[in-house]
Amino acid sequence: MSIEWIQGACAVPDARVQAASLARQEQLTKPPGALGRLEQLAVQFAAWQRNEQPTVQRIWIAVYAADHGVAAEGVSMFPQAVTGEMVRNFARGGAAIAVLARELGARLEVVNLGVVNDPGELPRVRRAWIAPACANICEQAAMTPAQLRDALAAGAESIAQARTCGTQLFVGGEMGIGNSTAAAALSCALLSQFPQAMAGAGTGLDAEGIAHKATVITRALAVHADAATPLERLRRLGGFEIAALVGAYIAAAQAGIPVLVDGFISTAAALVAVHLNPGVREWLLFGHRSQERGHAALLRALEAEPLLQLDLRLGEASGAAVAIPLLRTACALHNGMATFAEAGVSDA
């Protein structure tokens, strides 16, 4: 399978439904704009769904797990074995995102792309194995061209499955010790930022640990200074799960499925996806502003205003999942409120 599919046209929201939904908002029993961004969200979902009565009930959450060679540089508080252990935890339903998915009635897909501490076959885990880990970005490219192709395809496969269920919202998450370092390096390359501005606490590093992380990123950027395109930067500085997120975001936009983006690492993947296929941006919402240092710069680059700011930095799609009740509320108000005419209430 080639990767030419990532350049394919994205779906276009329905302008007629958008206009009709805006007109309805103006007639609901409230002052114009009184429900603020909730009004905008409802209209956005109506246009996405081509339905003047939008809902956000069928949700597909995919968490991509993969290990990183850069973990050998001591950039995390946790050992690399944790990635595989967390895959088991996802499968057993004990992780934060598993709890949130149950609470939301969402479908949770866990995808094992390659972990050092391999848990093997597990129920409710899709095995899309590429390698035990991507390479150390301080020494060589994270992925070969074939590995990048397979990682992108693994993300697209999530969307292919989600489409068969009539999914109304896709949420992507990640798990991988060392992946905040890879995401920060990738973000530096895409935004021409200094590592000190993008390196954050990740799993809980102190100031000394963050400074070391920035030094590691500086080394990686020097090794890959000749990476000239977004795709090549992803191949050299990213990782399997970051590339899978990129593939999922592009495929979702092509399929007309809205995406709720999670935190720092997921937003770095979203930025790559938009660089590769600008039509993706129309289908992205951003769940929250992470506590991770570099997230604000990524959001600015994407002209994104996240729904929540709760000082989260867990990943796993958890922050995005927490924002889903807001989307449901927006649609419920849009669909359920009476118009002035229906209620017999005088308009202004």
Curated annotation (Swiss-Prot):
EC number per UniProt: 2.4.2.21
Keyword annotations from UniProtKB, A to Z: Cobalamin biosynthesis, Glycosyltransferase, Transferase
Pfam family, one: DBI_PRT
Catalytic activity: 5,6-dimethylbenzimidazole + nicotinate beta-D-ribonucleotide = alpha-ribazole 5'-phosphate + nicotinate + H(+)
Pathway the protein takes part in: Nucleoside biosynthesis; alpha-ribazole biosynthesis; alpha-ribazole from 5,6-dimethylbenzimidazole: step 1/2
InterPro entries: Nict_dMeBzImd_PRibTrfase, Nict_dMeBzImd_PRibTrfase_bact, Nict_dMeBzImd_PRibTrfase_N, Nict_dMeBzImd_PRibTrfase_sf
GO BP: any one term: cobalamin biosynthetic process
Function statement: Catalyzes the synthesis of alpha-ribazole-5'-phosphate from nicotinate mononucleotide (NAMN) and 5,6-dimethylbenzimidazole (DMB).
HAMAP family hit by this protein: CobT
This protein's name: Nicotinate-nucleotide--dimethylbenzimidazole phosphoribosyltransferase
UniProt gene name: cobT
